[in-house]
Amino acid sequence: MNQLTSLYLAALNRVTWQQPDDIEFPAPLAQQWLLEQGSLSRRMATQCEHLTVDLLSNQIMLADTLSYDETQLLASEEYLLRQVIIYGDQQPWVFGHTLIPRSSMHNQPFDFTQQGKIPLGLTVFSADNVKRDALQVGWVETELGRLLARRSRLWMNNKPMLVTELFLATSPIYSKERV
């Protein structure tokens, strides 16, 4: 695990998760991004010429590595851990941390273990039966400044996954003007 990945994971572990109604959003644009119910990947793609993914981790993990919070949102079983950095025009915008229970990977139209450098949101939101719940947002102080984060449970064909996103300093979510 490289130093930046460690920094991002440590930041996510320090986020105080809140319900969207309980947080003061820094700007309407940030609120729109954090409360996005559709594909964040699609939203990001509209803000740049080239949206790319750097795959940091894509491996099956044991259930005992889940945090308490994660076990409250997902079944305690083996899961696929997918960690990525999503870039817009070669600028790091989002660190993504996704947990997909093994049972959620069965009978799906896609093989998530082979997702590779394709943004997960593009795959998930191309399915017919997708919904988001348990949306939480928060701030975290890092060496790179104060960063926003969100996590939510996505249901694809009635099977859950937990998606957590840390919005990096160069992300358009922090733009002063509407992008």
Curated annotation (Swiss-Prot):
It comes from the Bacteria. One of its GO terms (molecular function) is chorismate lyase activity. It catalyses: chorismate = 4-hydroxybenzoate + pyruvate. InterPro entries: Chorismate--pyruvate_lyase, Chorismate_lyase_/UTRA_dom_sf. Pathway: Cofactor biosynthesis; ubiquinone biosynthesis. Substrate binds at R82, L120, E165. One of its GO terms (biological process) is pyruvate biosynthetic process. Its EC number is 4.1.3.40. Pfam families: Chor_lyase. The keyword Transmembrane helix does not apply. One of its GO terms (cellular component) is cytosol. It is found in: Cytoplasm. Keywords: Cytoplasm, Lyase, Pyruvate, Ubiquinone biosynthesis. The keyword Zinc does not apply. Removes the pyruvyl group from chorismate, with concomitant aromatization of the ring, to provide 4-hydroxybenzoate (4HB) for the ubiquinone pathway. Belongs to the UbiC family. This is Probable chorismate pyruvate-lyase. It comes from Vibrio cholerae serotype O1 (strain ATCC 39315 / El Tor Inaba N16961).
